[in-house]
């Protein structure tokens, strides 16, 4: 029975995707050690495993509890690329005879390229058939959107959050989130945010510049994963009253992501489906989808 350690940086939700990939193939039981504390998980199965003691906290990715890791007989450490900032941790684990695998799913620009990483973990656990089935569910959802009559809506979508200094954090063009919007039949704005160079797929811009480039967006999807979910337009406007002039705000086309958006890599087909529904629905009463709410 392989004991796996996942050392993950606490502050970085983007790097917790491996846990969701293990969840999708019913493999969370094979993870004994976590680099994220219980309150850092939105994935229920991970929370439950930590609560019951099946999974235990083994220190942050850059300061793991080596003694605990050795005592637990860990057979493989799965790290995010954050480990490259602390090569001494990787060296030490390998000195102790623990192989280290660096998880690079976050470098995939096609959303389902990220989801497909579940097949790799399935090979480790002998669950290839489970992974094939779960992956096909997501590709089927994407195919359905891509072959629908309204696959190209021409609607523009801004996806952003406002940080504590009042700057607007947007995705770069070619990043997997802007690609999800394009695959869903939308057009991501602002258009000229530069290509994602993988190392950093987001950038900050001043509100005035964002206003000039995105105020006519047909839809706003507010990224709530960093500073918590919004439930009203007033909460959005409290972040910047300039948003009141945005077309999407005036038209009532403002949606907000759920907090678990970036921890759930295995459902990116469902997320694309959600965005497509937002762009094509005529149902004004629709205000709740799998990963978004109005």
Per-range role (PLM):
Residues 1-14:
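Short, small-residue-biased leader/transition segments that mark boundaries at the very start
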Residues 8, 21, 54-60, 77-80, ...:
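Second-shell loop/turn segments in exported
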Residues 11, 16, 20-23, 130-184:
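Basic- and aromatic-lined ligand-binding clefts that recognize polyanionic substrates
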Residues 17-124, 208-227:
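Acidic/His-rich segments in extracytoplasmic proteins that coordinate ligands and/or metal ions
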Residues 92, 99-108, 160, 173, ...:
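Catalytic cores of extracellular degradative/oxidative enzymes
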Residues 108-126, 130-137, 219-294:
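Structured C-terminal subdomain patch of bacterial secreted/periplasmic proteins
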Residues 140, 144, 176, 204-209, ...:
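Alpha-helical scaffolding within the catalytic cores
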